[in-house]
């Protein structure tokens, strides 16, 4: 795992920085934090972390530019291996897909933009984005929807997590014309994958100190498919007696999120429902530009925006909001045990928003993407100093 190799690198960096005895007696997290401080003083101590970067479509390249500029200013010891894959810019092929997969498998960690999927059917049902996630078995998508201090919305002080299974369900690309004018779309639900995502959700809740998990479903109508998903969640819930478990039908969940989102803590759900709820919940705290996301398999971690939108109409206009991507990049650094740099960047982004002088159009301001990046860089400073 990249995180493990990162800790080893941090150990060597700490010793090289003149603290040969500092590692002894420290926990892994404390040692990583201390080592990360030494990196801030000399990021060239010993190499850097390789990370796959996939800018994607729309404003993706502009958001990745923001990440690279902020990382450079913060002296983050990360080396990006950039690849380009697009179905709308004639940059998609099996060869390019394999190159991206090879890079991700080698590095274990990636940061990606939205790979836009054309509406038109051109002979292949599964998009490159979907194929990428399946081949890496990125079964768990996690979107942390949290209000940003200083930015007022209809609902404030929100803090909820949406976890969805993203390798099966309605988005399985299994469609066919059974008779002329009749299309059948198959929804796949398996016990193994339903149990896996349920366990992931309860493990996440336990690790993060959360108190409640709600399974979102439509088992009243899809009695077998969603019924199996719900049954698996109920079985897994019995193994976690300290975590409160509830269930909620998807249509009621949408209404409750708008009326009283404070009742939610961790939500776990099948693929399509999660895709919809991610976007709805993002709208509660400011929209697609402010919510980070991440996807996990047993081996790989991919960091991205929580609400996946290419925002093609903003390309080249210097108006895209880098907040979500920068916060996602911060989460990536935490995954790599670069706690110092992670906190530095996240704190800088949040300070820019809290001060309120520099805000992009989607947040009611008039600042450009460049203005926002410069302001974030101006707020970088040693965490805790």
Swiss-Prot record:
It is found in: Mitochondrion. Heterooligomer of subunits alpha (IDH3A), beta (IDH3B), and gamma (IDH3G) in the apparent ratio of 2:1:1. The heterodimer containing one IDH3A and one IDH3B subunit and the heterodimer containing one IDH3A and one IDH3G subunit assemble into a heterotetramer (which contains two subunits of IDH3A, one of IDH3B and one of IDH3G) and further into the heterooctamer. GO terms for molecular function: magnesium ion binding; NAD binding; oxidoreductase activity, acting on the CH-OH group of donors, NAD or NADP as acceptor. The heterotetramer and the heterodimer composed of IDH3A and IDH3G subunits can be allosterically activated by citrate (CIT) or/and ADP, and the two activators can act independently or synergistically. The heterodimer composed of IDH3A and IDH3B subunits cannot be allosterically regulated and the allosteric regulation of the heterotetramer is through the IDH3G subunit and not the IDH3B subunit. Plays a structural role to facilitate the assembly and ensure the full activity of the enzyme catalyzing the decarboxylation of isocitrate (ICT) into alpha-ketoglutarate. The heterodimer composed of the alpha (IDH3A) and beta (IDH3B) subunits and the heterodimer composed of the alpha (IDH3A) and gamma (IDH3G) subunits, have considerable basal activity but the full activity of the heterotetramer (containing two subunits of IDH3A, one of IDH3B and one of IDH3G) requires the assembly and cooperative function of both heterodimers. Its main location: mitochondrion. GO terms for biological process: isocitrate metabolic process; tricarboxylic acid cycle. This is Isocitrate dehydrogenase [NAD] subunit beta, mitochondrial. InterPro entries: IsoCit/isopropylmalate_DH_CS (IPR019818), Isocitrate_DH_NAD (IPR004434), IsoPropMal-DH-like_dom (IPR024084). GO terms for cellular component: mitochondrion. Keywords: Acetylation, Mitochondrion, Transit peptide, Tricarboxylic acid cycle. The modification N6-acetyllysine is found at residue 199. Belongs to the isocitrate and isopropylmalate dehydrogenases family. It comes from Pongo abelii (Sumatran orangutan). Residues 1-34 form a transit peptide.
């Amino acid at each position: 795992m990249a995180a493990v190799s990162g800790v080893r690198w941090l150990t060597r960096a700490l010793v090289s920085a003149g603290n040969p005895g500092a590692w002894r007696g420290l926990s892994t997290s404390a040692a990583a934090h201390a080592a990360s401080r030494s990196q801030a003083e000399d990021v060239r101590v010993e190499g850097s972390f390789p990370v796959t970067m996939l800018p994607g479509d729309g404003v993706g390249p502009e958001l990745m530019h923001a990440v690279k500029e902020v990382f450079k200013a913060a002296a983050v010891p990360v080396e990006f291996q950039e690849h380009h894959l697009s179905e709308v810019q004639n940059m998609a092929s099996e060869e390019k897909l394999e190159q991206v997969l090879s890079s991700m498998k080698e590095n274990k960690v990636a940061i990606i933009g939205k790979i836009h999927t054309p509406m038109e059917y051109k002979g292949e049902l599964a998009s490159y984005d979907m194929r990428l996630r399946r081949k890496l078995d990125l079964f768990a998508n996690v979107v942390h929807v949290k209000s940003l201090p200083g930015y007022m919305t209809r609902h404030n002080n929100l803090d909820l997590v949406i976890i969805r299974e993203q390798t099966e369900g309605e988005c399985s690309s299994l469609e066919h014309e059974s008779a002329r004018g009749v299309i059948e779309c198959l929804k796949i639900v398996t016990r193994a994958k339903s149990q896996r995502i349920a366990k992931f959700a309860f493990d996440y809740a336990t690790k993060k100190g959360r108190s409640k998990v709600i399974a979102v479903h439509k088992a009243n109508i899809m009695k077998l498919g969603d019924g199996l998903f719900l049954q698996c969640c109920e079985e897994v819930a019995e193994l976690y007696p300290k975590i409160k478990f509830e269930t909620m039908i998807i249509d009621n969940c949408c209404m409750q999120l708008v009326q009283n989102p404070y009742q939610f803590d961790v939500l776990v759900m099948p693929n399509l429902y999660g895709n919809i709820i991610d976007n709805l919940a993002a709208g509660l705290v400011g929209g697609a530009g402010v919510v980070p996301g991440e996807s996990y398999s047993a081996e790989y971690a991919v960091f991205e925006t929580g609400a996946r939108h290419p925002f093609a109409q903003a390309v080249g206009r210097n108006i895209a909001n880098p907040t979500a991507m920068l916060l996602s990049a911060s989460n990536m650094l935490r995954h790599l045990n670069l706690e110092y740099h992670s906190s530095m960047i996240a704190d800088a982004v949040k300070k820019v928003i809290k001060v309120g002088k520099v805000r992009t159009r989607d947040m009611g301001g008039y600042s450009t993407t460049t203005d926002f990046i410069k302001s974030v860089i101006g707020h970088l400073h040693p965490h805790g100093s």
